[in-house]
Amino acid sequence: MKLQTSADLQRWLQAGGPGPLHLVPTMGALHQGHAALIRAARQQGGRVLVSVFVNPLQFSPNEDFARYPRRLEEDHALALEAGADALWAPQPEDVFPAGAAGLTQLAPAPELVANLCGPSRPGHFEGVCTVVSRLLALVQPSHLHLGEKDWQQLQVLRRLVRDLRWPVQIVPCPTLRERDGLPLSSRNAYLSVEQRQQAALLPQALAQGQQLLDAGQRQAEPLLRAVRALMEDGGLAVDYLQLVDLPRLQELEQVTGPALLAAAVRCGEARLIDHRVLMSRLPILAIDGPAGAGKSTVTRQVAHELGLTYLDTGAMYRGVTWLLQQRGFEPQEGEPLQALLADLELRFGPASGTEQTLLVNGVDATSAIRTAEVTASVSAVAALPSVRAALTQQQQQLGQQGGLVAEGRDIGTAVFPDAELKIYLTATVAERARRRAADLAARSLPVPVLSQLEQEIADRDHKDSSREVAPLRQASDAVELLSDGLSIDEVVAQIVALFREWVPVEALNADA
C-alpha cells in the first residue's frame, strides 16, 4: 500500500489496531541495505511502515538535495517485496505544516557532532533530529529501525530518544556491503564504472587499520597516517579520517578498547562515508550487583541475545562452597583449603534446560550449588583471599580472548576492569526476597517466610560490601540498573541496547 498525505497515514494507522508498529525511515532510492532493515522489522512481528522523505533540512546549500535519487515506484516495489505493509511518501507540507519559518528545530548533543561529519556538514544533524522527531510524532511507532552504516547519526538519534524519553525502541542493523566491501548507499549511483572501482579503496584502506592494530600499532597518529596514505595514493580526496570511541565519538590517542575508524571521502561527485570497528579482542560485558538481583538469569539471556559466552562466576564460587561442605571443611584459610584449591577443576558444560551445567571435579553439582545451605555460606567463602585469587585467575584466563558476558560481585572492579560495558544490576531487598522465594518454590525446595529471606539478603549485602577482599562495589564507570518493576525481558532489552552503543552488531557479525 502506498500512502502520501498525513490523512492517508492516519487512516492506515487507525485501521491497524494494537500491536507493534515498526518504522523504517529512509530518503528513498532504496537498496538491499534498506531491504535488510525491512526484513529485520518483519521478523519481529507487527506492522512495518517504510517512510520515504528527502528531508531538505539535512542538506547544506551546496549539497545534493536537488539531484538526490528519487524513484518512488521502484522504492514501493522493493519495500513491499522485503515485507513492508505500507510505504508512506509525504510532501514537505505534511511533515512540516508550518513551513521552515514556523518550525521548531531540535539540536543534537554537541559532543556527538564535534567530530566526523559534524564540522563539515553544519546543520545536517539538526535537520536529522528535527525530521525524525516529526516522523515519530506522526507515526508513533514502537520500534525504529536504523542502519549502523551511519553510526554517527545512529548515536545522535539514540541520545535524542533517551533524553526526550520517547517510548520507542531503536533497533540497529549491521552495515551491508557490496562484494568488494563498499557499503551499500544511495549515493553510489553517482559513481561511474571507473569511480566505482576507485571507491572500493575506501573499505580496503580502513581494513588496513585493523591489520595495523593486529600487528601491535595502537597509537592513533601513525595508524591514521598509514590509512590516509592508502586513500590518497588511490586518488580519494579525504574529507576526514578519525579514530574515535564508539559511544561518544570523541577522538582517541590510542586504541584501548573497541574504536571507530571512520572516514568521509570524495570520489568524483560522490561523498562517501565508511567506518571500521577496530578491536584487539572480542568485547566483554560485566554485570555486577547484590545477591538476588536476577544477575544469573539476565546474564544468561543477554549472552544468548548477543551471541557471546556466558561466564557464571557466581556458580564457580558456589561450586567451591559446595565442595567445602561435602568435605566437611570450615570456610577458612588453611592447608585443607589450599589442598582443595590445588586440585580444583571447574568446568561448564552444555546447558541443561535453561541452566548451564557445572561440573565440580567431574561431578554435576548444578542443582546442589543452589540449595539454601550453599547460599548461606557462599559469601563467607567468596571473601577468602585464596579462593578469590584462584577463581579470579581462572576467570581472567577464560576472558583473555574476550567474547563473554560475566556476572558476579566484582567483575567490573577486579576481574575485568577493562570490560567494554559494566552494568550494576540491583533491586530492593523486598523485591529480591520475593524473587528468591519464587525461585526456591520453582525448584521444589523449602521456602522460608519472606521476613527471614529479607534478613538473610540484607545480612549478605552487608558481608559482601564490607569484606576486605574484593568487596561488592559499583564500578565508577558502571551503569546502574534498578530492576524493580521490570520483567526479565525488559531488563535484558535495556542491557542489550546499552551494549549496542559500545559494540555495533556488525562488530560481532562475521557476515557484516
From Swiss-Prot:
Residues the entry annotates as binding (R)-pantoate: 58, 153
EC number: 6.3.2.1, 2.7.4.25
Subcellular location: Cytoplasm
The UniProt record lists the keyword Membrane: no
Pathway(s): Cofactor biosynthesis; (R)-pantothenate biosynthesis; (R)-pantothenate from (R)-pantoate and beta-alanine: step 1/1
Gene Ontology process terms (BP): nucleobase-containing small molecule interconversion; pantothenate biosynthetic process; pyrimidine nucleotide metabolic process
Active site: 34 (proton donor)
CDD domains, per the entry: CMPK, PanC
GO annotations of cellular component type: cytosol
Pfam families: Cytidylate_kin, Pantoate_ligase
Keywords on record: ATP-binding, Cytoplasm, Kinase, Ligase, Multifunctional enzyme, Nucleotide-binding, Pantothenate biosynthesis, Transferase
Catalytic activity: (R)-pantoate + beta-alanine + ATP = (R)-pantothenate + AMP + diphosphate + H(+); CMP + ATP = CDP + ADP; dCMP + ATP = dCDP + ADP
InterPro entries per the UniProt record, alphabetical: Cyt_trans-like, Cytidylate_kin, Cytidylate_kinase_dom, P-loop_NTPase, Pantoate_ligase, Pantoate_ligase/cytidylate_kin, Pantoate_ligase_C, Rossmann-like_a/b/a_fold
Summary of the function given for this chain in its UniProt record: Catalyzes the condensation of pantoate with beta-alanine in an ATP-dependent reaction via a pantoyl-adenylate intermediate. Catalyzes the transfer of a phosphate group from ATP to either CMP or dCMP to form CDP or dCDP and ADP, respectively.
Family under the similarity heading: In the N-terminal section; belongs to the pantothenate synthetase family.
NCBIfam families in UniProt: cmk, cyt_tran_rel, panC, PRK13477.1
Protein name: Bifunctional pantoate ligase/cytidylate kinase
Organism for this UniProt entry: Synechococcus sp. (strain RCC307)
Primary gene name: panC/cmk
